[in-house]
Amino acid sequence: RFFAFQYGWSTFTIIQTAAISALAYVFAESLQSIVHLPEVLGSLSDYNIGNVFYPFKNFNVKLAAIILILLLSWINSKGLKLGAWLGTAILLLVFAGLFTIIGFGLTSHEANLHMAFSMQTTNSQPITISGMFTAMLAAFWAYQGWASVGYIGGEAKNANRNIPVGIAIGVFIVIALYLLVNTAYLSLLPISSLELINQPGNGIAAIEAVKIFWGRSGELFIAILILITTLGCNHVTIITSCRVYYAMAKEGLFFKSARQLNKHAVPENSIWIQCIWACVLVLSGTFDQLTDMIIFAIFFYY
């Protein structure tokens, strides 16, 4: 019970709310790359708290992220049926986009599958287990969604069977897509190019890979795909995470108001409490700061 209490509050303060904030931030940055967002409160951009947090820096992006969180929270407060319809539509669009990248990436004339499976490195240092683990650290966040399935166990039909099956199928799909997409990237971009892209401010590997066979239009395609993907992931994170605080509140471990259901049988107060804190986290830092907090907290409990 003690560790469950600790995990529940960590889920609220960092793990899930920071994930919501980070995903909304990526959505807003992708939107900024498509439609230039007007500057907001630019005169306050240098205001800081302890020379660490700059709440008004890139405030136009942060404001767009906050609006997205508010909108998705409102949609999810109107019932699971509306939320499920939106989630299904987004999922189909994401699959279509990913399979487009995989198909064109692996079959284009510029693709070199041998390069994708090469063990060549850009330095003389040997490949070690610790090095592989460090490289995979951020990638582990892609698999974190498996834990969220259990959050809605109380509302699932035949949960004892369907929850484990859903987790197994979901993780398998993520593994397959992750390997296929990265094979496409590696067949188009040599390791040296990926190393340069990984340096701060140099771009995104997906965009550079797609530009090889689609040119500048590929950049727009990836930006739109990132918009759709982060929208869908954020939607699911909001709809599942609030169930944790609802369950905690029923046991007296969270704010009492979070245990109340609205007329749609949804823990609306839990959703809005989560929404408020996620918006605060958006103002607190950048995408890198948010994801660093998430990964640290997640691995502590693993």
Provide a role label for each language-model segment.
Residues 1, 33-42, 120-121, 127, ...:
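TM-loop-TM module centered on a large, flexible mid-protein loop between adjacent transmembrane helices
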Residues 28-36, 92-120, 140, 182-191, ...:
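Hydrophobic alpha-helical segments and their helix-loop junctions in multi-pass secondary transporters
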Residues 5-6, 23, 62-67, 92, ...:
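Hydrophobic alpha-helical transmembrane segments
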Residues 60-111, 144, 167-171, 291-302:
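Membrane-interface loop-to-helix entry segments
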Residues 42-53, 110-122, 194-198:
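Membrane-interface helix termini and inter-helical loops of multi-pass transporters
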Residues 77, 156-160, 284:
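Helix-loop interface residues and adjacent transmembrane-helix termini in multi-pass membrane transporters
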Residues 1-69, 74, 226-247, 283-302:
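Hydrophobic transmembrane alpha-helices that form the core helical bundles
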Residues 64-71, 104-105, 122-176, 181, ...:
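Hydrophobic, membrane-embedded alpha-helices of multi-pass small-molecule transporters
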